[in-house]
Amino acid sequence: VGRDYNAEAQIFDHHQRPNPLRDDEQPYSSFGLIWAQYGRAYLTAMNVPTENIEAIHDNFDSKFVLPIDLLDNGAMEPSVAGPLSILTLSALLGSLKPVFDSTSETDDDDAFMAALPIARSFIEASIGNFAAKARAQSLVLEAIEKAGASPILELPMGMPYRSALDQAGADHILFVVTPRGDDWTI
């Protein structure tokens, strides 16, 4: 892409010197630059509620995009994953690249098109999980308010609740109960 980064021209290369940096001085990869430019619009297109877009954007950026940026820029070594390093998303997608002695003129494009739906499924699943956690947070905070001073928190279904308890400072909650079929779980 010409070793240039120009969001207005939709050029998102990160190989120029100095390379584009985040506010905290960590380097962007092309994926990070694209996410920074279009991530919020992507979340809107995925029907993430407006009030959750910033939090989910930042969460996805720090937990999904940043590690890819760091690996792509050599700021983090894949070996930090130990024997699982060949199973990182970057390594798995990289395994779809053409082999060194391939002579097909379309191999790079074919590999990209093979990787695209795989990457998309992980991106959308991750965002979906962050959005579900935000919905759970809201439900748990409502249940905490409804419970008042009771040491028992009743939730309408199983869901993540620990971060909402911490956020609300609900140290008085000793038990969390949720329905499971005709029974309850504690």
Over which residues does each language-model region extend?
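RNase H-like (RuvC/DEDD) metal-dependent nuclease/polynucleotide-processing core
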Residues: 63-149, 159-161
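Gly/His-enriched, cation/cofactor- and phosphate-binding structural elements
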Residues: 134, 138-185
